[in-house]
Amino acid sequence: MGSLTFRDVAIEFSLEEWQCLDTAQQNLYRNVMLENYRNLVFLGIAAFKPDLIIFLEEGKESWNMKRHEMVEESPVICSHFAQDLWPEQGIEDSFQKVILRRYEKCGHENLHLKIGYTNVDECKVHKEGYNKLNQSLTTTQSKVFQRGKYANVFHKCSNSNRHKIRHTGKKHLQCKEYVRSFCMLSHLSQHKRIYTRENSYKCEEGGKAFNWSSTLTYYKSAHTGEKPYRCKECGKAFSKFSILTKHKVIHTGEKSYKCEECGKAFNQSAILTKHKIIHTGEKPNKCEECGKAFSKVSTLTTHKAIHAGEKPYKCKECGKAFSKVSTLITHKAIHAGEKPYKCKECGKAFSKFSILTKHKVIHTGEKPYKCEECGKAYKWPSTLSYHKKIHTGEKPYKCEECGKGFSMFSILTKHEVIHTGEKPYKCEECGKAFNWSSNLMEHKKIHTGETPYKCEECGKGFSMFSILTKHKVIHNGEKPYKCEECDKATHAGEKPYKCEECGKAFNWSSNLMEHKRIHTGEKPYKCEECGKSFSTFSILTKHKVIHTGEKPYKCEECGKAYKWSSTLSYHKKIHTVEKPYKCEECGKAFNQSAILIKHKRIHTGEKPYKCEECGKTFSKVSTLTTHKAIHAGEKPYKCKECGKTFIKVSTLTTHKAIHAGEKPYKCKECGKAFSKFSILTKHKVIHTGEKPYKCEECGKAFNWSSNLMEHKRIHTGEKPYKCEECGKSFSTFSVLTKHKVIHTGEKPYKCEECGKAYKWSSTLSYHKKIHTVEKPYKCEECGKAFNRSAILIKHKRIHTDEKPYKCEECGKTFSKVSTLTTHKAIHAGEKPYKCKECGKAFSKFSILTKHKVIHTGEKPYKCEECGKAYKWPSTLSYHKKIHTGEKPYKCEECGKGFSMFSILTKHEVIHTGEKPYKCEECGKAFSWLSVFSKHKKTHAGEKFYKCEACGKAYKSSSTLSYHKKIHTEEKPYKYEECGKGFSTFSILTKHKVIHTGEKPYKCEECGKAFNWSSNLMEHKKIHTGETPYKCEECDKAFSWPSSLTEHKATHAGEKPYKCEECGKAFSWPSRLTEHKATHAGEEPYKCEECGKAFNWSSNLMEHKRIHTGEKPYKCEECGKSFSTFSILTKHKVIHTGEKPYKCEECGKAYKWSSTLSYHKKIHTVEKPYKCEECGKGFVMFSILAKHKVIHTGEKLYKCEECGKAYKWPSTLRYHKKIHTGEKPYKCEECGKAFSTFSILTKHKVIHTGEKPYKCEECGKAFSWLSVFSKHKKIHTGEKL
């Protein structure tokens, strides 16, 4: 039995029979015939469409269709297209024009007689084609028609004519609507259906209607998933036999259809036809909506669906709808995971053959599609089409939401997701949803850890082939894209997209578009949460994570989760420590190629990004963007907690950690935690000590390149960041930012413990440690702990004596750059920071900040032990050591311990004698900057600190504070024992010792104990005789620098401190202050024994020794003891006979400066101290004090032996010697002894005959001043 044919299942009607059928019966006939044909198609029997089916599909009557017209095979075949040519019966046949429906270009000479047909010529071009059909037809139906010299057999002449039309290419049939021509009536009919939208065949499943039943059948297979046609080679199944036929060509590799223009071959004629359009550029199919033209009608149909918004093809798995059935089939492969098309080169598999074809170009490198405008070649026509739009600027696809235009529909589709927020692709592992399937596929690899693309060099696996390709370049250094102009090869190659604004070029047009937004400021992507806009959708996507806090990317090693896959990938390298990207200059390796590229700019100095505002250039575009915000003042990122705004989102994120207190990054070395991984990375360098960035000027090395760049500005003096308020310039932007707070006064960082607010987060962090007392950084040398690593590093220099910072002016070196900066201000005299209250200027902002406290009086730092408050934390820290007795800083020379390093530094100068601070006015040198600063005021006479009560001005704030207490009589420090109040805590501390009698400071030499360490130190010098401070004028040595300074004033005669009351001048401000108390009459220090009051506590202490009889200071020469060290010093001169104080008037020399001062008054007759009772004047205040007793008759000093009272302690002391018989002062000439040194002095004159006191009136000379004074009264008439 032969094969089943369409004729076996077809029914024929004559005209009479057809007219007997009603409309329903005629429709039934049509449906049955079409259904029978579809079944044959489904079984693979019908290889082509009979004319009957064509007419029935077109709705035409078939009553005169004859039997031979219902067969599905012709005796004649054109092997060029493997298309049978159907014979027809009569020349008058109404269907004579409907014969050859698909192809137009076979010549008659290409026809041949199929097997069993003896009277038909063979087609001489394609001899192999006829064997592909199995069906046969009897030769009795043949009839020969001659055409020229060819014997081509047709059933009708019309068939021959129609076949000839195909070879000639003539198109006689024209569409009046679109002015398009066709060679066949069937083609014209098909064309008409496109714009009339005849859709007779409806799908019951999806409701969609089609023009042709075959299309409906194909569509239904999308719903059922039915694929009855299977490939024997690879097992892949297809829904249509024709698709299987096309598919088979893949395995054979046969490409019989060649393009005459470029020589490229194809395995299907349809593909060749499409290809030819590239050369002709013909686009006859135009869209009525937007005017866009297409080369294929199918593309036009697909395009129209864009305007209609129609998406009839729905996926049962996820519900997503598509406008084309082919897209739905491709989509289904996502769910099935099916990838039957494998690349023989690299083994990669694909879901579609077209994708495999595109992929193969990667291996061949072929680029057949060339742009006529710029000559650029591409691998695929779609890329060329996309490229051409760059030149035309065409963007036909408009977004209805925002009006934005796009060059491709696919880009529009992706863009629309932004507005809808639709994320149909969901991850089954973690539930995360994506806008596009490609994103989901990439995401899945996170969970699977799949890395199918292996590097043959190092074995490393990658999740994407593109990443593997990039990776390979590391090993081979391959640069496949070579420029014909300059022979230079690069990895990325050509950058044809140039910005007209700034000239920057890009590889891709998308990059250029994004770049242009920098100039236009366009930010089309808006965040619905906070309203912030972004220039790219990807940045918006990343931004959204800030609001959701979602972290779907988890590290399998340590469990840490991240917001973005890129961050996870970067994090994973921490565990692997892989750094494949190496710098050829310095050998440093990096885990990302982008970081290597940025790193290389350190060596090249390249800064391609320029700021148009100030001309400053940057190595990174991100840095330029951040910099621009400085000019714009834009701070779009706001903190919801405190309202503070920031220029960068990263800064906001860092800021948020302040409120949250979150510190997830922990250091394995020391356990310290950090809020950011980058800070942890920087911290780790402390433990490794690695410093790869070296300064070529001074050789100093740094941990980070940014620090090196900042350091270089020290040498260059570059200060690119300028303050608009005051014009001051800074070397770094961060310092400028901090500086600006000075002008605004803003303090956004608040302490939750005590409520104190700060300008900077760093200050708050430092402040918090006061409450926690946390000190994680410990010194290995001495065990001292610190709350900041920076302080520990500075502290270590004490032990190493490292001083890397050198002053170019004077050569002095410093351990800290801040100290060097402060020191430089001495040479420059620069004081840019001015106090608004009093106008005083300072060289550092920190000093100005400290100074301001004087005006506010604020004391936020309180001691928990005693309740005392301080203005600065450093003072509190220093104070605390009083309670602990801690003295960690030891002097290597003498072993003495100090509570602060600064005090140790000052102390060390005693041993070295170094005096680096020199006064330009008088040439005087000083060991310390503070003393030097005070000295300068001597010349300038500047007094910035003014008392509001009396208008008096002072040079230092401490003196003003002390002075103010005179007006307020403020004595806040009360002692509970006696109720007495004191103006300062230090005086209270000293006072307490009186009640406790405590003397903790003991001399190891003689066992004597003292109340204060300073007294013990003074005392020790008695035993050691240490006098390290020597006078260059007279070689006299002193135990203390203050004594030497006082002594020098003797030689210089310098007395810059003058009393405004009486005009008296003093060498020292302390002496002037003491003197002023004389005028004020202020005597706050009262003796509890006798009620006597004193100006100074030291005077009271000396006075008390009268009552106690204490004389701690002993003369080693004669054994005599004294109540004060100063009296002992004076006494020692008796034994040495030294008289360093010489009178310039008469040449007389004295042992003490006080005696010289008293002597000088003889020449001037100056008596500034007047008695208010009698008006008498005196040369010294002490004499006035003694004189006053005459008027009061007061006798405070009583002898315990006999009860006799005296006005002065000296008289009492003299009196006591009557009872004791003590006469310690012996005359070396005659051996006579005296009870007082003054009597001995007077006695000595007998032996010398010296008479220094001469009367100017009569010329008489006297040995003693008292006798001389009495003699003067003879001439004046004054009563003796």
Swiss-Prot record:
<dbReference type="GO" id="GO:0006357">
    <property type="term" value="P:regulation of transcription by RNA polymerase II"/>
</dbReference>
<feature type="zinc finger region" description="C2H2-type 4">
    <location>
        <begin position="257"/>
        <end position="279"/>
    </location>
</feature>
<feature type="zinc finger region" description="C2H2-type 34">
    <location>
        <begin position="1113"/>
        <end position="1135"/>
    </location>
</feature>
<keyword id="KW-0539">Nucleus</keyword>
<feature type="zinc finger region" description="C2H2-type 25">
    <location>
        <begin position="861"/>
        <end position="883"/>
    </location>
</feature>
<feature type="zinc finger region" description="C2H2-type 19">
    <location>
        <begin position="693"/>
        <end position="715"/>
    </location>
</feature>
<feature type="zinc finger region" description="C2H2-type 24">
    <location>
        <begin position="833"/>
        <end position="855"/>
    </location>
</feature>
<feature type="zinc finger region" description="C2H2-type 17">
    <location>
        <begin position="637"/>
        <end position="659"/>
    </location>
</feature>
<feature type="zinc finger region" description="C2H2-type 3">
    <location>
        <begin position="229"/>
        <end position="251"/>
    </location>
</feature>
<dbReference type="Pfam" id="PF13912">
    <property type="entry name" value="zf-C2H2_6"/>
</dbReference>
<feature type="zinc finger region" description="C2H2-type 9">
    <location>
        <begin position="397"/>
        <end position="419"/>
    </location>
</feature>
<feature type="zinc finger region" description="C2H2-type 10">
    <location>
        <begin position="425"/>
        <end position="447"/>
    </location>
</feature>
<feature type="zinc finger region" description="C2H2-type 15">
    <location>
        <begin position="581"/>
        <end position="603"/>
    </location>
</feature>
<keyword id="KW-0863">Zinc-finger</keyword>
<dbReference type="Pfam" id="PF00096">
    <property type="entry name" value="zf-C2H2"/>
</dbReference>
<feature type="zinc finger region" description="C2H2-type 27">
    <location>
        <begin position="917"/>
        <end position="939"/>
    </location>
</feature>
<feature type="zinc finger region" description="C2H2-type 26">
    <location>
        <begin position="889"/>
        <end position="911"/>
    </location>
</feature>
<feature type="zinc finger region" description="C2H2-type 35">
    <location>
        <begin position="1141"/>
        <end position="1163"/>
    </location>
</feature>
<feature type="zinc finger region" description="C2H2-type 13">
    <location>
        <begin position="525"/>
        <end position="547"/>
    </location>
</feature>
<feature type="zinc finger region" description="C2H2-type 5">
    <location>
        <begin position="285"/>
        <end position="307"/>
    </location>
</feature>
<feature type="zinc finger region" description="C2H2-type 6">
    <location>
        <begin position="313"/>
        <end position="335"/>
    </location>
</feature>
<feature type="zinc finger region" description="C2H2-type 31">
    <location>
        <begin position="1029"/>
        <end position="1051"/>
    </location>
</feature>
<feature type="zinc finger region" description="C2H2-type 39">
    <location>
        <begin position="1253"/>
        <end position="1275"/>
    </location>
</feature>
<dbReference type="InterPro" id="IPR013087">
    <property type="entry name" value="Znf_C2H2_type"/>
</dbReference>
<feature type="zinc finger region" description="C2H2-type 28">
    <location>
        <begin position="945"/>
        <end position="967"/>
    </location>
</feature>
<feature type="zinc finger region" description="C2H2-type 20">
    <location>
        <begin position="721"/>
        <end position="743"/>
    </location>
</feature>
<feature type="zinc finger region" description="C2H2-type 38">
    <location>
        <begin position="1225"/>
        <end position="1247"/>
    </location>
</feature>
<dbReference type="GO" id="GO:0008270">
    <property type="term" value="F:zinc ion binding"/>
</dbReference>
<dbReference type="InterPro" id="IPR036051">
    <property type="entry name" value="KRAB_dom_sf"/>
</dbReference>
<comment type="function">
    <text>May be involved in transcriptional regulation.</text>
</comment>
<feature type="zinc finger region" description="C2H2-type 8">
    <location>
        <begin position="369"/>
        <end position="391"/>
    </location>
</feature>
<dbReference type="GO" id="GO:0003677">
    <property type="term" value="F:DNA binding"/>
</dbReference>
<feature type="zinc finger region" description="C2H2-type 29; degenerate">
    <location>
        <begin position="973"/>
        <end position="995"/>
    </location>
</feature>
<feature type="zinc finger region" description="C2H2-type 22">
    <location>
        <begin position="777"/>
        <end position="799"/>
    </location>
</feature>
<protein>
    <recommendedName>
        <fullName>Zinc finger protein 208</fullName>
    </recommendedName>
</protein>
<keyword id="KW-0862">Zinc</keyword>
<dbReference type="GO" id="GO:0005634">
    <property type="term" value="C:nucleus"/>
</dbReference>
<feature type="zinc finger region" description="C2H2-type 7">
    <location>
        <begin position="341"/>
        <end position="363"/>
    </location>
</feature>
<feature type="zinc finger region" description="C2H2-type 32">
    <location>
        <begin position="1057"/>
        <end position="1079"/>
    </location>
</feature>
<feature type="zinc finger region" description="C2H2-type 14">
    <location>
        <begin position="553"/>
        <end position="575"/>
    </location>
</feature>
<feature type="zinc finger region" description="C2H2-type 18">
    <location>
        <begin position="665"/>
        <end position="687"/>
    </location>
</feature>
<feature type="zinc finger region" description="C2H2-type 30">
    <location>
        <begin position="1001"/>
        <end position="1023"/>
    </location>
</feature>
